[in-house]
Amino acid sequence: MTEKTIALLENRINDLECQVAFQEQTIEELNDALTQQQLLIAKMQDQMKYVVGKMKNMDSSNMVDPAKEPPPPHY
């Protein structure tokens, strides 16, 4: 191989190493974002279960049948 070919190959290897380094950083950032989203989703699911449980336990006698309500006043 000539010196020119070797220099081109070395440059190509350096470029590929830079690309891999940037990809590793991007993958790590995406993994961190995904982890945060998973934690947020889990928290939201717990909150939703709590709200649904509260709604199921509500006394249905407190709710007024819309058919029995008087009509709203007309202006």
Curated annotation (Swiss-Prot):
Signal peptide feature range: none
Q: Which NCBIfam families match?
A: PRK04406.1 (NF003357)
Q: Which family does it belong to?
A: Belongs to the SlyX family.
Name assigned to this protein: Protein SlyX homolog
Species assigned in the record:
Vibrio vulnificus (strain YJ016)
